Amino acid sequence: MFVPDPLRAAVSDEAWLAAMLDAERALAEVTGDEEAAAACHPELYDVERLCEEGRADANPVVPLARALRERAPGAHRGATSQDILDTAAMLVARNARELVLAELDGAAAAAASLAEQHRSTPMAARTLLQQAAPTTFGLKAAGWLVGLVDARRRLAGARLPAQLGGPVGTMDPELTSRFAAALGLEEPVVPWHVHRGPVAELGAALDAAAAACAKVGLDVVLLAQTEVGEVSEAESGGSSSMPHKRNPAAAVLARACARIVHANAGLLTAGDYEHERAAGAWQAEWPALSAALAFAGGAAAAARRSLEGLEVHADRMQANIAVEALPGEGAATAEALVDRALAHYREST
């Protein structure tokens, strides 16, 4: 209900297994172990069994490495479990991020269309939930647009480095360089086993993206209230007990997904890990990262649906304005700000 199917698949246990095996294959290739590389096919392994066996070690790479060595004794040579899991996390994030970015692009395009279409549509601005002074709906949509564009840019720029430090971070950096290149990931300056900047950066970027979507959702929910009635979603949700209701369901989902991202972002941005390997904090990242990626995409997809089908009731906006009509100077300023937002959007596409 919350997350689009492609995103669910992108962060599934099967996706993590495939990513771990991609990391193992790249390690085998850069060390010249063809037998180990040939053993790195997901269909050869039972993901449910690996998850179950991984509980005993608090780590799914331990049983995976054991299974790999049954087929190729040289597999996993020189690496530690965290090398494989951190690299897999970056691969999972890379694939899922593309899906999140696509949904953000769709939401931004819809916001841009609304901003342009309603550049001069007057409405009441509200501060502390009270009417303040007139503005335009185009400017409100322009604010959504800039928030989405800037969040998208931040997420797209988040670093995704490979990890190959060996048991205590002393692996040959030349090998790490070739390993990263084989996977198309960034080469780290030093191993980041307990220096979690990349994970924190990704978590913060996903959180910001979710917040931009939640802002859209909250504004739509408030504007769609019966007593306000200034917008409505084309595909409104219903009620099990009150058939007359038209609930802004997509906006509600955008807010719900964003809250789940916020809850998981704290686990990704904590950062205070002990010595050369964290006991518990690192392990907590895995489900938190999957959830943050999935629900950030869910928030963006819901915001996109809400905006693409948003019905704007300009007559109700005009009727709700409790003060004199927007003076010419104010209208011109609002329109100019809309144009600035649209230019910012076009520069980003």
Mark where each language-model region is.
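Weak global preference for isoleucine
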Residues: 84, 260, 321-323
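Charged, flexible cofactor/metal-binding loops and thiol motifs
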Residues: 89-102, 109, 116, 123, ...
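Short alpha-helical "patches" and their helix-cap loops
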Residues: 34-40, 106-107, 223-227, 236, ...
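A helix-coil-helix interface module used to build multimeric assemblies
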Residues: 1-167, 171-176, 238-239, 249-253, ...
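Histidine (H) residue identity feature
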Residues: 41, 45, 76, 118, ...
